[in-house]
Amino acid sequence: MNAGQPITLWTVEDVSVYLGVSVQTLYTWRKRRTGPPAGRVGRHLRYDPDVVRAWFTDQSKAA
């Protein structure tokens, strides 16, 4: 992370588009603890894009 640079986090909708899955699928994965990790900002879920990409890469290797 660069000092002074704003942190860009993805919304559930952003991750949905990136992975090509529905928003509901992301919520289901979160409930089952199988999807990419997310954090809360207030009451909103946010995803670190680098973590989502790494999770996707790991899933691709496992397939």
Where in this protein do the model-derived segments appear?
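Short intrinsically disordered terminal tails
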Residues: 1-3, 57-63
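Polyanion-binding surface elements
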Residues: 1-28
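Short helix-start
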Residues: 9-14, 37-60
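Major-groove DNA-recognition helix of helix-turn-helix-type DNA-binding domains
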Residues: 19-46
